[in-house]
Amino acid sequence: SVGFKAGVKDYKLTYYTPDYETKDTDILAAFRMSPQPGVPAEEAGAAVAAESSTGTWTTVWTDGLTSLDRYKGRCYQIEPVAGEENQYIAYVAYPLDLFEEGSVTNMFTSIVGNVFGFKALRALRLEDLRIPPAYVKTFQGPPHGIQVERDKLNKYGRPLLGCTIKPKLGLSAKNYGRAVYECLRGGLDFTKDDENVNSQPFMRWRDRFLFCAEAIYKAQAETGEIKGHYLNATAGTCEEMMKRAVFARELGVPIVMHDYLTGGFTANTSLAHYCRDNGLLLHIHRAMHAVIDRQKNHGIHFRVLAKALRMSGGDHIHSGTVVGKLEGERDITLGFVDLLRDDFIEKDRSRGIFFTQDWVSLPGVLPVASGGIHVWHMPALTEIFGDDSVLQFGGGTLGHPWGNAPGAVANRVALEACVQARNEGRDLASEGNAIIREASKWSPELAAACEVWKEIKFEFPAMDTL
């Protein structure tokens, strides 16, 4: 008889393998799945494994031409989610050979491709990925990483300070450059193009690059510190994006910027390679992330997007504030902040980390805290994020009653006061307000900032809970 038997058979017969021992080279995924009523968890988990690897809805003749055992994804464990009805965490192991080397794009096309539209599931969310060292090693990763960046900037022992230039749309290039200069002159390390500033009719990219470069050099000369402005190279085509990055390099500026989700992983990886070859730092903005990661039971958790960015390449990435106006629950945020910075991260379910991740020697990424933060948040930010971070105050700099430069001074004084207090062994969590008040006695700029923002809070419950 012929070995081929046509017809539809249950996924779980082939793809649910509870006895499977995961290999060190497997990519492991944790999915939060909500099956349709009446679909057993094992069948749903097996369906996820099948549809994101070798399976299709019916047996096909060509299955006989390959070795399914070698190439199939396997659902090897299923656990119910506490407190949720009919929701499970399904663990899936993928053989390494299913993925193209050095391609985040291909990895995502497989793991989070068609399977998310699968009818037997009401919802599906990718909670975490374990990237094996064998696969990590096929990626260049961040152009420079944390240590090289500090050496380039000659700034040690404290978080870096930034500011997004507002209003985000509508300024002319010359006025934009002026705002950049004032912020850098006041004491910030970086200023930033807003993520939606690309090359619009009111300010074409080349004009902006030129005026910002002038601002950087003038501020450097006057302060004796290295300064940078994240020049947004994001564009409608990869070629245009590269053209902008090349122009930035010709101006001799230290850093460019990219919106990695709207620009796409392929473009981002190309830009990251260019940045390493040409000594440019790369700042990454995560515009569009909340579309993908904010729903609790469908989509992709940001920790996965953060891991993907570390593989694709970026030296800074926005990662929530814990205290400002945007999403972020403390333990979970710190979980993916560590995934960005550290070489080795232990599995820790209380922080949402489903797998131990070994990055081997892939450089780290600086997390950027940005969004609704001001001087009163400085002690908490210094405490939560530590030295290896970038703290960005947009409105918290430009909204200062006396102008941009005094706003920058206020932030820098607050930061230096917090770092000094921490180094003296004081507890920033309990003494934070006192530390800021004390510092404001000898800094009128800080005193004015303290007055303006003394009552501002963004108190809503976080959605990103376990």
Swiss-Prot record:
User: In this chain, where does the modification N6,N6,N6-trimethyllysine occur?
Assistant: K5
Biological processes per GO annotation: photorespiration; reductive pentose-phosphate cycle
User: Which residues act catalytically here?
Assistant: K166, H285
Keywords on record: Calvin cycle, Carbon dioxide fixation, Chloroplast, Disulfide bond, Lyase, Magnesium, Metal-binding, Methylation, Monooxygenase, Oxidoreductase, Photorespiration, Photosynthesis, Plastid
Gene Ontology MF terms in the entry: magnesium ion binding; monooxygenase activity; ribulose-bisphosphate carboxylase activity
Binding of substrate, residues:
N114, T164, K168, R286, H318, S370
PANTHER family linked to this entry? RIBULOSE BISPHOSPHATE CARBOXYLASE, RIBULOSE BISPHOSPHATE CARBOXYLASE LARGE CHAIN
Function, as annotated, reads: RuBisCO catalyzes two reactions: the carboxylation of D-ribulose 1,5-bisphosphate, the primary event in carbon dioxide fixation, as well as the oxidative fragmentation of the pentose substrate in the photorespiration process. Both reactions occur simultaneously and in competition at the same active site.
What further fact does the record state?
The basic functional RuBisCO is composed of a large chain homodimer in a 'head-to-tail' conformation. In form I RuBisCO this homodimer is arranged in a barrel-like tetramer with the small subunits forming a tetrameric 'cap' on each end of the 'barrel'.
**What is the protein's name according to its record?**
Ribulose bisphosphate carboxylase large chain
Q: What is the lineage of its organism?
A: Eukaryota, Viridiplantae, Streptophyta, Embryophyta, Tracheophyta
